Amino acid sequence: MNIKQLVYISKATEPFTAASLKQLTDVANANNAKLNVTGCMAYSAGYFLQLLEGSAETVDSLYRKIEKDTRHKGTRLLLEATVDEDKRLFGKWFMSSFNVDTTVDFPAELKQNITEIINDRKAIIPVHRLFMEFRKHLGQ
């Protein structure tokens, strides 16, 4: 069976604290569990970079809902791909998140790559590989 992977970036309308990021992640985790959607969300320099994985119809519907969320603006789609179910990157997590800015041991190359994406420049690491690196860093 195939699933859809979708990656987007957006700018937070207000700064997110560790507590507000955890609250957002907890809600996403509960909602995504019901939808069989998995993924990862990175927060850096006031931006969200998120990967969603699941059935194409569900991911598309969820993305349309996310685009309307007032906690962020300037949603920009970076990647849409159809992959085999066994290529799901975050199968153990309905939603994982982390704050790149406060993660002490986060690799400098990955931070630089996020900055390149935020500034709409060609990323050093393709966005799909970036999430593979996130997965390694998060220990999945």
How should these model regions be labeled?
Residues 1-140:
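Charge-rich, low-complexity N-terminal segments
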